[in-house]
Curated annotation (Swiss-Prot):
PPR repeats lie at residues 40-74, 75-105, 106-136, 137-171, 172-206, 207-237, 238-268, 269-303, 304-338, 339-369, 370-400, 401-435, 437-471, 472-502, 506-540, 541-576, 577-607. Residues 612-685 are annotated as: Type E motif. Keywords: Mitochondrion, Repeat, Transit peptide. This is Pentatricopeptide repeat-containing protein At5g19020, mitochondrial.
Amino acid sequence: MIKLIRFFRSRRCWVISLQARCFSAPSRTHFDFSGESSDTERALVSALGSCASSNDVTCGRQIHCRVLKSGLDSNGYICNSVLNMYAKCRLLADAESVFRDHAKLDSASFNIMVDGYVRSRRLWDALKLFDVMPERSCVSYTTLIKGYAQNNQWSEAMELFREMRNLGIMLNEVTLATVISACSHLGGIWDCRMLQSLAIKLKLEGRVFVSTNLLHMYCLCLCLKDARKLFDEMPERNLVTWNVMLNGYSKAGLIEQAEELFDQITEKDIVSWGTMIDGCLRKNQLDEALVYYTEMLRCGMKPSEVMMVDLLSASARSVGSSKGLQLHGTIVKRGFDCYDFLQATIIHFYAVSNDIKLALQQFEASVKDHIASRNALIAGFVKNGMVEQAREVFDQTHDKDIFSWNAMISGYAQSLSPQLALHLFREMISSSQVKPDAITMVSVFSAISSLGSLEEGKRAHDYLNFSTIPPNDNLTAAIIDMYAKCGSIETALNIFHQTKNISSSTISPWNAIICGSATHGHAKLALDLYSDLQSLPIKPNSITFVGVLSACCHAGLVELGKTYFESMKSDHGIEPDIKHYGCMVDLLGKAGRLEEAKEMIKKMPVKADVMIWGMLLSASRTHGNVEIAELAATELAAIDPSHGGCKVMLSNVYADAGRWEDVALVREEMRTRDVEWSRAFSGVV
């Protein structure tokens, strides 16, 4: 015994007392000291538990050797302790060896091994062992439920929980908290309320661990009234509880309620401040987020890398903001610029701010081998129309990931180089270990839409159907848009109807089919689809109304178009932009209501562009209005003096009116100024 004590002390793994801090919760479950164990057993079990907690494999192996030499491996408690040590340290080959040679396997042995498999994310092995267990307890079921939850198999976790309940196995607070977490990801409100009722029935609702998970569940399911009611009724709250409720308001966009709750937190931590900053950024309130950030610094809190990434990314989205430069200075001052992802974010910030030189300088000063920085530079070049430079960086990147390929393929698709986008896509699927994802396919279908090649579109669609890429609304919208732009509106409509009741929870697929139908002259179909949309809890957006107004324009439905235009702001809170005004000018102009079209242009919040004045000029010629034609031509020439199309159109207006002297003057002016002739204008759609 004295030699054993000296050995443990020499390895610094001797634990003098058997206090609870020496063991994790599972250890207390596995081992029972009722006074029958000898001091040697206690010492060994305690030391092995300490090794498991501290992940001290070297010391654990040495103790295992001493156990074998002493012949104590026949002792069930000690053997389970050795098994637990290897399982906790994720040395499953050693754990399996001990398990096979175990002389006295019991339910604790099986539970330890199942827990080891779950910790190492070997769920299949855990399931196989679970199925052959001679006796399953609450610990067995709880461990496997945790395994399902870790692998995002929420439905399976709930199913196993129901099996456990049907067998009459009593659950504990760990089981219930784990199941509540799984249920929160499934989003079923009735299951949520059932679990809360169960917690009350088992008198576990007062446990902070359980009640906090219940609160988190309601927040994830966006049942914030239930969440707040539970929060107010909780007998005990900790900072985690406050932060969960705060995060629920923040994620739901309820900033005022979040602010009110935030002010009530007496001891805020970095999570509390970060939640408020994140909530403001989600609402595009950068200035408010920076106020919280500044106040946080005054309270002595240090920002995290993730927080700085979020703030700088938001600054990049805020056009004309100088906040990003100040944040960059703070990042350098605090030494955050050595973090790889912050370096990539800084590159992205300058690229989006159209300062590609500074982005390139930041890249040169960063760790060039870091893939995120290279991807940021590729995307930056693409954003600034420098596709060749982007390709150069792409070709020099040896460890390309999915973001590298997506940035480059998207760059070609956006820069009107669809053939190059498709060529790179074929290279990706034939020679790269990186496989396309949904974002890749969106860019591919966009490129095919530009080409108008139905054959290419069908090939890409076939590839998608045989792949493992999960569908989403944006991908569905891209497919619908591709078929519509390639002239196969029936196929686009079939795909829309096949998917709208299965996965469509956003506006994207609706926009694709409405705009596609309108573009190809199916105005009634587009407007009928919009009517169907209004009966659903899906909100239209700016793009939706471009399609709707285009449909009205094609069908000559002036009054209906005006009604929809006015409803944008009054009914949906959408401010019309230049595309919507362009649709209305085109609609009014084609109907011969040129004065109204002119007044519409005057009311625009932004200056009319070449397209809008061109449409008014074209409509003026169609309806023989020389005065408005002269106005449109003058405005058009002021925007683009080198564009000869307006002069040609104006001379044709004069010719139609028989004003041949004016025709001669316009033609002479064109020859004098060497203005290029442009023969045509096209409408918005």
